[in-house]
From Swiss-Prot:
Residues 7-119 form the MTTase N-terminal domain. SMART domains: Elp3 (SM00729). Residues 137-368 form the Radical SAM core domain. SUPFAM superfamilies: Radical SAM enzymes (SSF102114). It catalyses: L-aspartate(89)-[ribosomal protein uS12]-hydrogen + (sulfur carrier)-SH + AH2 + 2 S-adenosyl-L-methionine = 3-methylsulfanyl-L-aspartate(89)-[ribosomal protein uS12]-hydrogen + (sulfur carrier)-H + 5'-deoxyadenosine + L-methionine + A + S-adenosyl-L-homocysteine + 2 H(+). Keywords: 4Fe-4S, Cytoplasm, Iron, Iron-sulfur, Metal-binding, S-adenosyl-L-methionine, Transferase. Catalyzes the methylthiolation of an aspartic acid residue of ribosomal protein uS12. [4Fe-4S] cluster 1 binds at C16, C50, C82. Transmembrane segments: none annotated. This is Ribosomal protein uS12 methylthiotransferase RimO. It is found in: Cytoplasm.
Length: 439
């Protein structure tokens, strides 16, 4: 029998969904605390930080300082995750307000660290396994599943390998066991994540690891829907695209950050790919029926000239991604691009503004294409007093958009789960829809 401590825990998980999985592992170890969103009343404040780019680092630092200012006397403030790991040699002196620091290797030991009130930094990066009990947050029907940690790519701008290490893939059986366990608890929709998902099992000498995973999930039949994030162009193949297309469970969702399209820029970025390869993959994705394609672009990488930017801009306008994330180059220590001559900030800002217009135009077109036709969706929960919150099955939670269903049009309350719905209008990134039937 699990006995609740008479203590409150405030968890703040910053950054990506991969960080969220690690936060949920820590919640699993701290199950006997009562969760609160109020920093001021918490006995333990746990901030799982992000240290990917400058803006994320600043957000993490500010969140820590705000918590330190607001915490009650005697409360324990903990900083875990990427920022702590990346700057572990200096962070203790830089932010003395923190009581416990830990990096990316000891999420499953957080309860011991709190009990002993001590820092801990293991050499090995933690990789969540099926036996690590997690408390899933934010949904009763959707969960993220991490399939690997680390990355073997050598992108000029990315510091992740310097603190997350080389690629280490989970065993396929461990993933299947976790999926089965979560599905039995009602999580019938999952998103599979990694730093480089398409390289899954490369470290074990297998080039078709992600295809194996897709087929094993299909055979298992524990889920009703799933999708994959973070395909890397050089390890993505036509066969992988075909496996996703033919899967009855995995949605035709393709998230592949290309970063650029110019061959000269791809070489400068050390992306180990080419425009021709990008186009081959992207055109194959677009040929898939009802495909949804998301990508990420970096603007202002050192030595990006006007011609290369214009080539990128023209391509993005022609290809029409459903969703597009656009980031300004962030100079990060321990990367090849850090010491290269920078593009002026004014130029970067102007380029981002131009690309954002293109991205918004095609995003709106993607939303409009859903109007007045039945789509498969996942109803998550009640949003306020009058609406249920839902999303297109191809979408990732909190990322690709939101669908609201007016409860006044319903004869009975909706349970979280899978439904066919009909969108009728949209504004910004929100669709309004009515329910047709469950499935």
């Amino acid at each position: 029998m699990q006995v609740k401590e008479n203590k409150q825990l405030c968890l703040i998980s910053l950054g990506c969904s991969k960080n969220l999985v690690d936060s949920e592992v820590m919640l699993g170890k701290l199950y006997n605390y009562t969760l609160t969103n109020d920093v001021k009343s918490a006995d333990v404040i746990l901030i799982n930080t992000c240290g990917f780019i400058e803006s994320a680092k600043q957000e993490s630092i500010q969140t820590i300082l705000n918590a330190a200012k607001d915490k009650k006397e005697g409360a324990i403030l903990i900083a875990s995750g990427c920022l702590s790991e990346r700057y572990k040699d200096e962070i203790k002196e830089l932010i003395p307000e923190v009581d416990i620091f830990t990096g990316v290797g000891d999420y499953d030991k957080i309860d011991i660290m709190i009990a002993k009130k001590q820092n801990q930094f293991s050499e090995q990066v933690f990789l969540s396994e099926h036996y690590n009990a997690r408390i899933i947050t934010g949904s009763s029907v959707h969960a993220y599943v991490k399939i690997s940690e680390g990355c073997n790519q050598k992108c000029s701008f990315c510091a992740i390998p310097s603190f997350k290490g080389k690629l280490q893939s989970r065993e396929l059986d461990s993933i299947l066991k976790e999926v089965e366990d979560l599905a039995l608890k009602g999580y019938k929709d999952m998103t599979f994540i990694a730093q480089d998902s398409s390289s899954f099992l490369y470290d074990k000498g297998q080039k078709d690891g992600l295809i194996q995973l897709i087929r094993a999930i299909d055979k298992q039949q524990a889920l009703k829907s799933a999708r994959i994030l973070y395909l890397y162009p050089s390890s993505t193949t036509l066969e992988l695209i075909g496996a996703i297309e033919s899967s009855p469970i995995f949605q035709n969702y393709f998230d592949m950050p290309i970063q650029h399209i110019s061959d000269s820029m791809l070489k400068k970025m050390r992306r180990n790919s080419s425009q021709a390869h990008h186009l081959k993959l992207l055109n194959a994705m677009k040929q898939v029926k009802e495909s949804f394609i998301r990508s990420t672009i970096i603007v202002g990488h050192p030595e990006e000239n006007e011609g290369e930017f214009e080539e990128l801009s023209a391509f993005l306008d022609e290809f029409r991604f459903d969703r597009l994330n656009i980031f300004a180059f962030s100079a990060e220590e321990n990367t090849h691009a850090y010491s290269l001559e920078k593009v002026p900030k004014k130029t970067i800002n102007a380029r981002i503004k131009a690309l954002n217009k293109i991205a918004l135009k095609h995003q709106n077109h993607s939303f409009k294409a859903l109007l007045n036709k039945p789509i498969k969706a996942l109803v998550e929960n009640k949003e306020g007093e009058y609406f249920y919150k839902a999303r297109d099955l191809r979408w990732v939670p909190e990322v690709d958009g939101e669908i609201l269903i007016n409860d006044s049009e319903l004869t009975t309350p909706l349970k979280p789960g899978h439904y066919t719905i009909m969108p009728s209008a949209f504004k910004d990134n929100i669709l309004l829809a009515k329910v047709l039937s469950p499935f």
